[in-house]
A protein has these predicted regions:
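Short beta-strand scaffold segments in enzyme catalytic cores
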Residues: 5-11
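A short acidic/small-residue loop/turn micro-motif
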Residues: 22-25
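ATP-binding/phosphotransfer module of carbohydrate and carboxylate kinases, centering on a glycine-rich
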Residues: 15, 31-153
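Short secondary-structure boundary segments
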Residues: 1-3, 100-101
Length: 153
């Protein structure tokens, strides 16, 4: 989660693709305020509401410059959780790894988990949310290492 919201799905250890690459960042999610979003195609899709550029547009500052206690983070956690609820409902994943520039704000993880738990409302049993929703084990190098891994396979 940074300049956009990209999602990869692995099934049986292999990337899942259909007729074209997944565009989960462009799913529509409920928005509780008047912010129109920044996506040039959909405006208020998940990426248009919760990506780095949307944070800057909504709050007038880059995410990295906002204090950890800024109200933006509660809104961001809510928006990210809404997208994750759709992913959980549709894919029943074993793991959701959230990385990128926006997710370098570590205070987001417990906030997102709390929002997911509240929104899921015990609909079905979920694994421990701290195990389900996690940060990349490879830190900021995960994107490049994953790309190299895909190319080499």
């Amino acid at each position: 989660i940074g300049t956009g919201i990209g999602v990869g799905v692995l099934l049986g250890g292999k990337p899942h693709v259909g007729n074209f690459h997944l565009e989960i960042g462009h799913m529509l999610i409920p928005n509780s305020d008047k912010f129109k979003g920044v996506c040039e195609i959909h405006g208020d899709c998940w990426e248009g509401l919760a990506s780095g550029p949307s944070i800057e547009s909504r709050w007038g500052s880059e995410a990295s410059k906002l204090s950890k206690s800024h109200e933006a983070w509660e809104k961001e956690a809510d928006l990210l959780a809404k997208g994750l609820i759709n992913i959980i409902s549709n894919h029943s994943p074993d793991k959701i790894i959230m990385g990128g520039g926006v997710m370098s704000q570590k205070q987001l993880f417990p906030m997102i988990r709390s929002n997911v738990e509240r929104a899921w409302n015990k609909y079905t049993p979920l694994v421990s949310l701290s195990n389900l929703i996690s940060e990349p084990g490879l830190g900021t190098d995960s994107g490049i290492i994953g790309s190299i891994s895909l190319i080499s396979n």
